């Protein structure tokens, strides 16, 4: 790899409603790196009993999201009817394609007791020919 291809991406902190992420992409001067649109490191965040993340239902199109947790658990729900918890070591791959709506929230059991959350989420641009593919969701324990 040539020295001209090397660069350092510095994250900026973004509040997502009750917890912060360190967002590496997009940033200046790099809006994307290859197909990667967003690259977020969530946490580590400690939630007291009764608290947690509440990413309300929202749409995506033309991309895929990949979620991986180190700590905690998130409950994913989407317009396909999927209800799936993601735990440390699992991978959730959601392909938005022509459109999907989803939410991500702290699992009810952990909301009752309090929990720690830490993980990664990246948004990947689908190839042009797949941007309008059927939406899909897959869970890989």
Where are these regions (language model features)?
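Short, Gly/Pro- and small/polar-rich lid/capping loops
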Residues: 1-11
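A short glycine-rich, His/Asp/Glu-containing loop-to-beta-strand
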Residues: 14-70, 119
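A short beta-strand-loop-beta hairpin characteristic of the jelly-roll/cupin
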Residues: 66-88, 101-103
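Short, compositionally biased
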Residues: 105-117
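Conserved, well-structured core segments that form or line functional sites
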Residues: 118, 125-141
């Amino acid at each position: 790899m040539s020295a001209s291809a090397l660069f350092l991406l510095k994250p900026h902190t973004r509040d997502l409603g009750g917890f912060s992420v360190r967002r590496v992409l997009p940033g200046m001067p790099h809006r994307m790196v290859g197909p990667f649109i967003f690259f977020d490191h969530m946490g580590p965040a400690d939630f007291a009993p009764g608290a947690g993340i509440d990413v309300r239902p929202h749409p995506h199109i033309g991309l895929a999201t990949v979620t991986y947790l180190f700590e905690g658990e998130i409950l994913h729900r989407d317009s396909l009817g999927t209800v799936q918890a993601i735990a440390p070591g699992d991978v959730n791959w959601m392909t938005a394609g022509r459109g999907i709506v989803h939410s991500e929230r702290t699992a009810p059991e952990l909301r009752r007791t309090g929990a720690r959350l830490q993980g990664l989420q990246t948004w990947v641009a689908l190839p042009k020919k797949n941007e309008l593919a059927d939406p899909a969701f897959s869970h890989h324990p």
